[in-house]
Amino acid sequence: TIINVKCTSPKQCLLPCKQIYGPHAGAKCMNGKCHCSKI
């Protein structure tokens, strides 16, 4: 899932992804935006 959070590293995406998917969320930074996944 692409979320509307700008990023330069996956660490910046981890908290917003965890808010959506819970503690086991996966976070990636692609093309300057966060991508979250449920693990």
From Swiss-Prot:
Provide any one GO MF term from the record. ion channel inhibitor activity
Keywords attached to this entry: Amidation, Disulfide bond, Ion channel impairing toxin, Neurotoxin, Potassium channel impairing toxin, Secreted, Toxin, Voltage-gated potassium channel impairing toxin
SUPFAM superfamilies, A to Z: Scorpion toxin-like
Going by the entry's taxonomy, the superkingdom of the source organism is recorded as: Eukaryota
Q: Identify one Gene Ontology CC term for this UniProt entry.
A: extracellular region
The set of disulfide-linked cysteines is: 7-29, 13-34, 17-36
Q: Which residues make up the annotated site Basic residue of the functional dyad?
A: 28
Stated family: Belongs to the short scorpion toxin superfamily. Potassium channel inhibitor family. Alpha-KTx 02 subfamily.
Cite the domain annotation text.
Has the structural arrangement of an alpha-helix connected to a beta-sheet by disulfide bonds (CSalpha/beta).
Its protein name is Potassium channel toxin alpha-KTx 2.17
Organism per entry: Centruroides tecomanus
